Design a protein with these regions (language model features):
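N-terminal chloroplast transit peptides
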Residues: 1-14
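Glycine-rich Rossmann-fold phosphate-binding loop(s) that bind the pyrophosphate
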Residues: 362
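Conduit-forming functional cores of very large proteins
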Residues: 358-359
Length: 398
């Protein structure tokens, strides 16, 4: 997402009453007095973004990273070969965002809102993030938990367009996985123009979220339906952290599923086989990590998400010293919870080491939190043994 997002109230503060009625084209082509602080601020935020698209015409309107919907000016429509392919009216991004959020609020349920937002992301990525950033509190539960869990359960039924990259057990070699991630420079027949083609549409990847779908939220093994988790998590990377969408890569490692309901589901989009385990599984993960490092460099961030308990800790220990990676369920959740507990100490006036902790559940998240709580109590002077004595984990058997 390029540029900054202005809230209406802030825009009203900067615009004079006459400027509010200018069209987008008039507004952007007006003469600016850069000595005026207000006009300079507006110029920086709303100056025209000069991008030469790699496609034109209908293909441009089908490219979510380039499509601006009805915000294309007349000159842009004529130059890019889309004049006549859009309705004749012109709408600013703000107007389009208002239309989207108004329609979302009239949907009958959260899953319908998720489907509509998913379609918008496929159609106009910049508008999708504009709507999301302007309505974070309202839309975060739609884009991610809890609605994404329901969407994953019904992913085969609501599936529209592919998002992310699927690495299967049949791609179990560094060269095959690298081929999927590749970004090749090709030439047109007359060698007068260059264009890029690839399995994945962007080359400069800085953040990867990967899951094998074995333990999706609290819903269990959802197999290939788990792709909704990396997609949703990276949408939050963009909306909350300002990461460029083109730097993000959602990945689903498909090694099958042990969920018989999915294997019997006629709409299931993944491999119809039981999960691969053992050395073959480990080799696939090793090859995936090597291919990512080979393609995107040592510093590419790889976030492990919703792996099963038996693999989550093991893979974290296996890769943490050699790759820029972390497990969100173990480390990400734990860091947030411990930060909250540390904030509570300001109210209770007690150190964390002066309290005992009971966990309802003994999954990856609970164990990760417990380990980080123990580390914090050790930092406060307790021995590891004394710190562990203050931790109680209640598993499914009580």
């Amino acid at each position: 997402m390029l540029g900054s997002v202005l809230k209406t109230s802030r825009l009203d503060m900067l615009l004079s009453s006459s400027e509010r009625f200018l069209s987008t084209t008039q507004f952007l082509t007006r003469e600016w007095n850069l000595d005026d602080p207000k006009q300079k601020a507006l110029y920086k935020l709303y100056r025209a973004e000069r991008v030469t698209p790699s496609v034109r015409g209908v293909d441009l309107l089908k490219s979510p990273d380039l499509n601006k919907g009805m915000a294309f000016s007349l000159q842009e429509r004529q130059y890019l070969g889309i004049h006549g392919l859009l309705p004749p009216a012109f709408m600013t991004e703000e107007q389009q965002a208002y239309r989207v959020i108004s329609k979302l609020r009239k949907q009958p349920n959260d899953l319908a809102r998720y489907i509509q937002l998913d379609a918008l992301q496929d159609r106009n990525e910049k508008l999708f993030y504009r709507v999301l950033c302007d309505n974070l509190k309202e839309l975060m539960p739609i884009v991610y938990t809890p609605t994404v869990g329901l969407a994953c359960q019904q992913f085969g039924f609501i599936y529209r367009n592919p998002k992310g990259v699927y690495i299967t057990i049949n791609d179990n070699s560094v060269s095959k996985i690298y081929q999927i991630l590749r970004f090749l420079l090709n030439f047109l027949e007359n060698f007068s123009k260059k264009f890029f083609s690839s399995n994945w549409k962007f080359n400069e990847i800085k953040a990867i979220v990967v899951t094998d779908g074995e333990r999706i939220l609290g819903l269990g093994d959802l197999g290939a339906y788990g792709i909704g988790i990396p997609v949703g998590k990276l949408a939050l990377y963009v909306a909350l952290a300002g990461i460029q969408p083109r730097w993000c890569l959602p990945v689903l490692i498909d090694v099958g599923t042990d969920n018989q309901e999915l294997l019997d589901d006629p709409f299931y989009i993944g491999l119809r086989r039981n999960r691969v385990t053992g050395p073959e599984y480990d080799t696939l993960l090793d090859n995936f990590m090597k291919a990512c490092r080979k393609k995107y460099g040592q510093n590419v961030l790889i976030q492990f998400e919703d792996f099963g308990n038996k693999n989550a800790y093991r893979l974290l220990e296996r890769y943490r010293d050699d790759y820029c990676m972390f497990n969100d369920d173990i480390q990400g959740t734990a860091s947030v919870v411990v930060a909250g507990l540390l904030a509570c100490t300001r109210v209770t006036k007690k150190k964390m080491s002066e309290s005992s902790y009971v966990f309802l559940g003994a999954g990856g998240a609970a164990l990760g939190i417990a380990e980080m709580v123990v580390l914090q109590m050790q930092n406060e002077g307790l021995s590891k043994e004394d710190a562990c004595s203050k931790i109680y984990l209640m598993d499914v058997d009580g």
